[in-house]
Amino acid sequence: MFTKTFSNNYMTSSQSAYCNLQQYHDSRVCLLKCCRVQKVDPYFPRIALNSATSYPTVSGTVSLPKAETVEPDLWIKSFKGNEDPLLSDGSHTGVNQLGGVFVNGRPLPDTIRAQIVEMSQHGTRPCDISRQLKVSHGCVSKILGRYYSTGSVRPGVIGGSKPKVATPRVVECIAGYKRANPTMFAWEIRQKLIEDQICGEENVPSVSSINRIVRNKSFMAQLATPTSVTPSVARPSSATSQNQRSPPRGVQQHMQQSTSVQQLQQFQLTSAATVNSLISRPAFAIPGTTHSINGLLGTFPHSSLLDDKFTNLSTHSADMSLVYPTGLVGEHDWAMRTPMVILPQNYCGQL
């Protein structure tokens, strides 16, 4: 009797303990299911947790939330608002760890960028900005760094060529600054362009670009300076060049022929004058300075010999400078062997 009563009591206590354990397990499962954060994916339906539904368990009934399917577009609009510029183009969207929606390959809208800068100016830390706006910390830091360096919140250009910053107006302003102050540095010119509101932080030329513009301007100025030659001689006026028309082709040939004939006649006259100067015989030659017998004896060669040689020279006057040196007459004559010296008039014939 005692054993049966003890066994009944033991079974009752064991059943109650098992039921309590099962109830505790069911409650923990319900708590985990209610607190679990679902993975966000805008391309699949979401489950909305609405009114509770009772589910039977071993220990009794447990209330669980009711599952309701929501369309993806409605869920996305309810997540970030009905008018989200990130979702307007229909690109591939994603959700970061903070729950913010982003589009791959697209920068943040200007409104969010301006809001980031405004919150930073009010003293909000970047980490707090990241949590409040649901934007990654790296994106916030990059936007603020770009704003502090360039003064602009607009995103950079992805691909393509940069816009031209050295416009004609900017080039002329740089040249004017350099003419006004030749010792001005390139970084001072860059700062001056920003102060005069000729350029902004986005389109101001770099220091290397300004140096290149200054070098090109100085080179062009050197080319523009006139040379030492008289301008009227070096560069005749256009009116003069137009008035001086070239003669016809036949007239040009005739003029060239006449010019060549005149040059030939002048050369012949010069040769004849050279021969006549050689015909004039010297008054006396210094003894011992010549190597011919005529020079040693103080006599002159026969006149017929001189006439023959001068006749040959006159007929071949054009080639005389190539055969004999200047001032010489013939190969076997005393005048060709040695140089001649003209003595003064008061010379009496003795050395």
Curated annotation (Swiss-Prot):
Pfam families: PAX. Residues 91-217 bind DNA. InterPro entries: Homeodomain-like_sf, PAIRED_DNA-bd_dom, Paired_dom, PAX_fam, WH-like_DNA-bd_sf. PROSITE patterns: PAIRED_1, PAIRED_2. GO terms for biological process: apoptotic process; positive regulation of transcription by RNA polymerase II; regulation of transcription by RNA polymerase II. Residues 169-217 are annotated as: RED subdomain. Residues 226-258 are annotated as: Disordered. Its main location: nucleus. Residues 94-150 are annotated as: PAI subdomain. Keywords: Chromosome, Developmental protein, DNA-binding, Nucleus, Paired box, Transcription, Transcription regulation. The keyword Nucleus applies. CDD domains: PAX. Residues 226-246 have a biased composition (Polar residues). The keyword Hydrolase does not apply. It is found in: Nucleus; Chromosome. SUPFAM superfamilies: Homeodomain-like. One of its GO terms (cellular component) is nucleus. GO terms for molecular function: DNA-binding transcription factor activity, RNA polymerase II-specific; RNA polymerase II cis-regulatory region sequence-specific DNA binding. Transcription factor. Involved in negatively modulating apoptosis in germline and somatic cells, acting in partial redundancy with transcription factor egl-38/PAX5, probably by directly regulating transcription of apoptosis regulator ced-9. May bind to the DNA sequence motif 5'-GTAACG-3' in regulatory elements. This is Paired box protein 2 homolog. It comes from Caenorhabditis elegans.
